């Protein structure tokens, strides 16, 4: 009976003094948003850390088509830019063409007299950057020769023809006099003259066309002079021809004079191309051109420029993200993610931010969970949430502003004789890409570290703000929660949340409850001790009763005990 009584009293004591379920106390926990499956990002201190949300910074795919807006994109179709400039018959449609970006197709071909350009890449780049094929004919006087030479290799319609921007000069009768022609530049812009020299396949062809056994072409300005002698000899047959034409070009500055001297083999200019300075360019691509809007174009197609980096192609035109080697770089746009644990303990799923985050928060990144005499509830804290969001919102735009190129990255081309220059250029470009790739990774890691630190700081600010409000009216439970030692209904909780809580109103009640509870408070860890003590006392009392019964029986003679030594 005594044992039973003691156990009942101890059990009643434990449950009656539990402050968590009391009507005169409340529990308030502070926490932050969490998701079941976060995103891994890299920071300065951690190679992988989970956050609630992140934004991809690397554009790794294109639209597959080239947008024709806001840039003027000219589709070269089956013509190269140089063929269009020379006036190849099948490229007549491009005469006087204008563009911001000229698209050369892999299917482009020449369909006139076979030619070569010793400095092809430079001429191609020069014309491409000019953005126009605007041509002005000039009245060159070629006395004593036959003009407008034609070839069966260059058909315009059903008739033999030639490059429309060049004039093939041959003998007149049985003579080819020495030609001396000058053409001043009296305008205020640069003029580009295209000319050439014919290399016959045989000596017989040479004398048949130009009389002399070997011709010569000299083109001069005040700044330069080029003298070219034909190389007579057979070459591989192209469109029925084993001869060749070499194309050269000369820029005449304002106030300068173009001088042409030749005694044979001259492919003369018919006029000049007006040179313009600008940011026009050329790109090799087989992507289709479509009606759409994009400020960044690559050979793979247009790409959005709303990300700071791209991994689509090194060659770009327009306002484009920086090319980097990484296929993915994630910028943290949320806080550190600590998924919510399973429901446990007498306080259910409610636990503070030190233990875990809270899933399912829809009204903020930070908030409160509480349990009082009216039940349980949850509410977000908009002020701390907005403070964190404001600092993160402009982060992506700042990164884009630091990295977007406001110019185009054109293709670099070199002739075979410039192999060492090409190798050096490739090394420089690869080094720049390596450097930018490293800088990009470092920049993102720094920004991610800052984001996580500032979101952690906002959580700590909210906790300290709450602590300062409650003062001695509550106790920090060590897990992000406060045990409030006075009756705190929903209106009281709301005053804590919005910062209007007056601790003086509840101070006396809190102190009184704290002293009463502290006298008998049993935390969950001491309940086991009470049970063990109860068990030990019960065993002791049973032993005492049993020993007393034995001694009483011995005195009455009902039990005899013999002790032998």
Swiss-Prot record:
GO BP terms in the entry: clathrin-dependent endocytosis of virus by host cell; fusion of virus membrane with host endosome membrane; fusion of virus membrane with host plasma membrane; viral budding from plasma membrane; virion attachment to host cell
SUPFAM superfamilies recorded: Influenza hemagglutinin (stalk) (SSF58064), Viral protein domain (SSF49818)
Protein name: Hemagglutinin
Membrane protein topology class: Single-pass type I membrane protein
Taxonomic lineage: Viruses, Riboviria, Orthornavirae, Negarnaviricota, Polyploviricotina
Localisation: Virion membrane; Host apical cell membrane
Gene name in the database record: HA
Organism: Influenza A virus (strain A/Equine/Uruguay/1/1963 H3N8)
Signal sequence residues: 1-16
Family statement drawn from the similarity comment of this UniProt entry: Belongs to the influenza viruses hemagglutinin family.
């Amino acid at each position: 009976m005594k044992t039973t009584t003691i156990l009942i009293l101890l059990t009643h004591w434990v449950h009656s003094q539990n402050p968590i379920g009391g009507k005169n106390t409340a529990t308030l926990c502070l926490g932050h948003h969490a998701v079941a499956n976060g995103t891994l990002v890299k920071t300065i201190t951690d190679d992988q850390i989970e956050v609630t949300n992140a934004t991809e910074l690397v554009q790794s795919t294109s639209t597959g088509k080239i947008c024709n807006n806001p840039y003027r994109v000219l589709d070269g179709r089956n013509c190269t830019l140089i063929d269009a400039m020379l006036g190849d018959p099948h490229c007549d449609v491009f005469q006087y063409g204008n563009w911001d970006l000229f698209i050369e197709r892999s299917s482009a071909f020449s369909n006139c007299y076979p030619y070569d350009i010793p400095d092809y890449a430079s001429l191609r780049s020069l014309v491409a950057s000019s953005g126009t094929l605007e041509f002005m004919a000039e009245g060159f006087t070629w006395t004593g020769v036959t003009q407008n030479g034609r070839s069966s290799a260059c058909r315009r319609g059903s008739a033999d023809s030639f490059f429309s921007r060049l004039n093939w000069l041959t003998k007149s009768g049985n003579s080819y006099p020495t030609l001396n022609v000058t053409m001043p530049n009296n305008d205020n812009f640069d003029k580009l003259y295209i000319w050439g020299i014919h290399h016959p396949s045989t000596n017989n062809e040479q004398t048949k066309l130009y009389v002399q056994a070997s011709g010569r072409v000299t083109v001069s300005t005040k700044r330069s002079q080029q003298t070219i002698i034909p190389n007579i000899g057979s070459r591989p047959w192209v469109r029925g021809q084993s001869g060749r034409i070499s194309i050269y070009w000369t820029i005449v500055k304002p106030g300068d004079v173009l001088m042409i001297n030749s005694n044979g083999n001259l492919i003369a200019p018919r006029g000049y191309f007006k040179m313009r300075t600008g940011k026009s360019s050329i790109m090799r691509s087989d992507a289709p051109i479509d009606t759409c809007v994009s400020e960044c174009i690559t050979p793979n197609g247009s790409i959005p420029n709303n990300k700071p980096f791209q991994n689509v192609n090194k060659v770009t035109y327009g306002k484009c993200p920086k090319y980097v080697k990484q296929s993915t770089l994630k910028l943290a746009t949320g806080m550190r993610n600590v998924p919510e644990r399973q429901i446990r303990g007498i306080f259910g799923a409610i636990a503070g931010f030190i233990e875990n985050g809270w899933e399912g928060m829809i009204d903020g990144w930070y908030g409160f969970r509480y349990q009082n005499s009216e039940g349980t509830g949850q509410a977000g804290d908009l002020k701390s949430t907005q403070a964190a969001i404001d600092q993160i919102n402009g982060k992506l735009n700042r990164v884009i502003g630091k990295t977007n190129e406001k110019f185009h990255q054109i293709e670099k081309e070199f002739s075979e004789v410039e192999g060492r220059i090409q190798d050096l250029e490739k090394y420089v470009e690869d080094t720049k890409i390596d450097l930018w790739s490293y800088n990009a990774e470092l920049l993102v890691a720094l920004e991610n570290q800052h984001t996580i630190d500032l979101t952690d700081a906002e959580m700590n600010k909210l906790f300290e703000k709450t602590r300062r409000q409650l003062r001695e009216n509550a106790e920090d439970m060590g897990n992000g929660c406060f045990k409030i030692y006075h009756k705190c209904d929903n209106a009281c909780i709301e005053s804590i949340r919005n910062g209007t809580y007056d601790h003086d109103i509840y101070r006396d009640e809190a102190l009184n409850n704290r002293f009463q509870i502290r006298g008998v408070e049993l935390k969950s860890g001491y309940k086991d001790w009470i049970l063990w003590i109860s068990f030990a006392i019960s065993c002791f009392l049973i032993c005492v009763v049993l020993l007393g019964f034995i001694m009483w029986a011995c005195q009455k003679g009902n039990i005899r005990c013999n002790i032998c030594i």
